[in-house]
A protein has these predicted regions:
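Aromatic- and glycine-enriched glycan-recognition loops and surfaces
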Residues: 301-362, 376-386, 402-418, 472
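Extended, well-ordered alpha-helical scaffold segments
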Residues: 230-269, 340-358, 404-426, 466-483, ...
């Protein structure tokens, strides 16, 4: 038996005592039983040959450099009978990991997440097995301690390689066994919808006598870049293994104009105020979104035009988060200034004024505008620091932008100041800024990393006022959240519609750390920006998932590469990556690492797919508003918007307000930020 060894600061294949990853003989599963055989090792050729009944399994290891090995597995049926089986490739850590990761799926056990979601390593005594299409690096698992990291993942160079699954098993001695299965399996259950587990899913390979099966995989060993950040090493290599080059389907100008078109379509008259409404969506959306409908009833309603008609049926108006009322309005204002459209500029300013007028003396306000008028309004919720953070940031940014064009609106600056003053006074050493608050100033939900959004609001307010208390409070908060969460490669609670580990909560920490680096010049903040960005991109798809001709992804030409998974509760892709483009480009500017540019371009190219344009407006038989885009892209056996999870590769019909706002924010930043304006990707 040989292994990946570490000696003299180099990784090699060998048989010594400095093992990091032990390379195991092949196994197959046949008729529900796992079988292995006699293995012959040839270190000179880098081969392990295992005989299992009539099968010969030959693994050839090729050194790809810096701890990365490509493995080519060839299975030949040398017998006289046809065999149906599942192939198992496995390695074992030679160290006891302190943490583990299945990207997009399981972040060290998903502590604090809901019971009917994948948590821990097992369920009902069996190891979780997840299909490749749930993970941003195919069938990837990673284990680490402070000294070493171990990862394996499938290649995307053939269908047989890619159609795979993965699992992790903790052994009695504290080591881990990491597995890749071919073909696809999900067990002991399929996580098929929001907090719903259904029956397992199994595929098998059949080989006739004389036939072969070939699949490629990778084994990776590293010394973690930072403690708990072996994923950073892995992601740097993944950027080379999987080409992230993509050609955007729209030009930046087209994306901007379509974003403005949709923001205008979202303008809504409500109780004498102009607001940005939450979305265009079908009436069926409410019951789908909360998974509050049976598959049978959903099937019935999907045939009823009353339920499937797309419209503005939900009177919800949120300051930040999912509706991005203020950000959309600021983008409308920027466009109106550029075009000389005074009427639209006044409308955009009016939206800000309506929100500012609701602020209490203590600085707080409801974060959903309709709650001032409808006590039992749809999606009623306590005010939260995600919205407060966006509110302070956008009021400060709008104040600055208007002032640069000769328009004084001190009310907007004062709004940000009062809101930030409240949280300077109510910051807690135990929970930071918390999550949800009453209007009276009581923290009713202290959990999560969501306070990063408020730290961003603090720094934008500091930029306007130069009051050092906002800078100091942001630094104090970041120290807290990094020490508790980010330094452990975890973020939670930013996605307000789930109880989950998620991606979007990392976004403000990238930006906040970059601002602090620019303000102080201290290296710790650049390292923190990198950490948050690596965590964010651990949710990114590095490859294109495979679909049949009947899939909507195939019909609409959607590619998963560059997309970012939502959370450990919501196993789908969204276009949130567009918001992180500018900070990723800033990281490239400050570090000189071009991989951040590649990542930014990939996220952008993914995020502009499926936008309704004059040439492409009809989806699911309905004409969508110009510039709209569905909120979710459902790449695996998980959905809330179909009666069965087997309809992999489909769009939903919730045409959200936030996605266009983030794209416009990024395009606006490209225009005004000299550091990144020449780094943006034009359509070829």
């Amino acid at each position: 038996m040989f292994s990946v060894q570490y000696e003299n600061q180099k990784f090699t294949l060998g048989e010594g005592t400095n093992a990091v990853i032990t390379l195991c003989p092949a196994k197959i599963e046949c008729n529900g039983k796992e079988i292995t055989g006699t293995a012959v090792y040839d270190l000179e050729k880098g081969e392990i040959c295992t005989k299992i009944a009539s099968l010969t399994v030959r693994d050839t290891y090729t050194n790809a450099g810096d701890g990365l090995y490509k493995v080519l597995r060839v299975i030949e049926n040398g017998g006289t009978n046809t065999l149906t089986f599942r192939d198992i490739f496995e390695v074992q850590t030679a160290f006891a990991p302190a943490r583990y990761l299945i990207p997009c799926v399981n972040y060290n056990g998903n502590d604090g997440c809901r019971e009917n979601t994948p948590t821990g390593l097992t369920r009902d005594g069996e190891a979780w097995i997840f299909a490749y299409d749930r993970t941003g690096i195919p069938a990837c698992t990673l284990c680490e301690n402070k000294n070493f990291g171990s990862a394996i993942f499938a290649a995307d160079d053939s269908e047989s390689s890619l159609r795979s699954a993965c699992s992790l098993v903790k052994n009695a001695n504290g080591t881990f066994t990491q597995r890749i299965y071919h073909p696809v399996v999900e067990a002991p259950y399929t996580y098929s919808s929001k907090n719903i587990l259904t029956e397992r899913y199994d595929e098998y390979t059949t080989l006739k006598p004389g036939e072969t099966f070939t699949a490629a995989m990778y084994v990776f060993a590293c010394v973690p870049m930072y403690e708990n950040y072996a994923a950073a090493n892995l992601l740097d290599h993944a950027a080379d293994v999987f080409s992230l080059a993509l050609d955007p389907c729209l030009t930046p100008k087209q994306v901007w104009d379509l974003g403005i078109d949709y923001a205008k379509a979202l303008l809504y008259d409500y109780k004498g105020h102009k607001m940005i409404i939450t979305h265009f969506a079908p009436r069926l959306f409410r019951s789908q979104h909360g998974a509050a409908i049976t598959p049978e009833e959903m099937q019935r309603r999907l045939r009823d035009p009353y339920y499937t008609e797309i419209g503005r049926f939900d009177e919800r108006f949120e300051m930040g988060w999912a509706d991005q009322g203020l950000l959309n309005a600021r983008m409308l204002a920027a466009d109106a200034i550029e075009r000389g459209d005074k009427e639209m500029l006044d409308t955009a300013i009016g939206i800000f004024e309506s929100w500012a007028d609701k602020q209490q003396k203590n600085g707080l306000l409801r974060t959903q505008f309709q709650q001032y008028y409808e006590a039992e309004a749809y999606d009623f919720a306590n005010p939260d620091v995600c919205n407060f953070g966006w509110g302070a940031a956008e009021m400060s940014r709008m104040y600055t932008m208007l002032r640069e064009h000769g328009i004084e609106k001190p009310k907007f600056r004062d709004f940000a100041v009062k809101l930030c003053d409240f949280f300077c006074e109510h910051y807690s050493d135990k929970y930071g800024f918390g999550k949800s608050w009453t209007l009276e100033g009581e923290c009713v939900m202290p959990n999560g990393s969501i306070g990063g959004f408020l730290a961003l609001g603090m720094l934008e307010t500091y930029r306007v006022t130069k009051d050092k208390k906002y800078l100091d409070t942001a630094i104090k908060a970041c120290n807290f959240y990094y020490n508790r969460d980010l330094d452990k490669f975890i973020c939670s609670a930013g996605a307000l519609d789930c109880q989950s580990i998620d991606k979007e909560t990392a976004y403000p920490f990238i930006y906040v750390s970059l601002i602090l680096f620019e303000e102080t010049g201290e290296q710790i903040y650049l390292d923190r920006a990198k950490k948050a960005a690596y965590y964010f991109f651990s949710w990114a798809f590095h490859y294109d998932v495979l679909y049949g001709e009947d899939s909507e992804f195939t019909q609409y030409g959607y590619h998963t590469k560059g997309g970012t998974a939502i959370s450990t509760e919501h196993h789908a892709i969204d276009s949130w990556g567009s918001a992180a483009v500018t900070p990723f480009l800033l990281l490239a500017h400050y570090t000189g690492d071009d991989r951040w540019v590649k990542r930014a371009h990939a996220m952008w190219a993914n995020a502009i797919q499926g936008i309704a344009s004059e040439d492409n407006r009809t989806f699911h038989g309905q004409m969508r508003p110009l510039g709209s885009q569905n909120e979710g892209f459902f790449q695996c056996r998980w959905t809330k918007y179909r009666p069965t999870c087997e309809e992999r590769g489909h769009y939903n019909d919730c045409l959200c307000a936030w996605s266009g706002a983030y794209r416009m924010m990024t395009l606006y930043d490209q225009k005004v930020n000299e550091k990144v304006k020449d780094m943006f990707l034009e359509r070829k």
